[in-house]
Amino acid sequence: MLAKLSADSLVKIPRYQALFGKKPLNKKDQEEVSQIISSVDQSFPNRAEGVKFLSERAWEYVSEGKLDTATYRFNLVHALDSTSVEAYWGLGVVAFQRLDFPGAIELLGKGLQINPKLSIMRVDYAIVKLSCYLKNLDCGNLEEVDALLSQALQEDPSNANAWMKKSQVAFLQEKYELAWSYFHECRALDLTQLDLNFSQQLMEKMPDPQGIFK
C-alpha cells in the first residue's frame, strides 16, 4: 500500500496530524469530533461497522493522494476505537508518504503491537525501514529489513510483495543468486508484484539462472 506522494499544505493543523498531533483538541474541534462519533453511533448497528466504513473511506482518500482528509478520517477511526489497527496502519502509510519515516515507524509499530500477525502491514513496516537505509538514515538497516520480511513470510508465505522486497534486499547485499530465487518466488505467486526495472538491474549483475528473463 505504500507509495510516495507529495506532502500536504495543511499538515501543521492538529486535525490533519496523526492522532490529532497527540494534543488536546480545541473546543470547536472537540465538539465536531463528538458530533461525528454520535452520528456514527446512530447511523450504524454497532460501532465496529462505523469504524469499518470510516476506514474504507479513509483508504480511498489515501489512494487519491488526499492525505489531509485521510489523516482526519483515520483520526476519527482512532477516536471511535483506540485499538483500531486500521487507524495506526493508515496513519503510518500517510506519514511515510509525507516522508516522515520515524513517524511511520512509530505508527506502524503500534499497529503491529495490536495485530502482530498482519503480514501485509509488516511488509509496509519493512519498506519504511528499507527507505531509511536507502536514504542513509539511521532508522533502518538491511539486516533489520530482511528479518522483518522473513517474519512476514512466516505469517503468510503467499505474500508476493514480501518476496519481491526480499529479492531487493538480497541484491543490495550482493547476494545475486539468492535475489533471483526470491524474484522467481514472487513471479510464481503474483506477476503484478514483479518490479521489471529491478530485474534489469539484477541481470546486469547476474544472468537469470532459470533463463526466463533475458
Where are these regions (language model features)?
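Sec-dependent signal peptide cleavage junction
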Residues: M1-R47, I212-K214
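Conserved positions within tetratricopeptide repeat
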Residues: T71, I105, C139, D146, ...
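Alpha-helical adaptor scaffolds
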Residues: W59-S63, V85-N161
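A conserved position within tetratricopeptide repeats
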Residues: D41-F44, H78, L112, L153, ...
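Alpha-helical segment of the N-proximal tetratricopeptide repeat
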Residues: F44-A79
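Terminal, low-structured helical/coil segments at or just beyond the last alpha-helical repeat
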Residues: L2-L5, I13, Q42, A160-K214
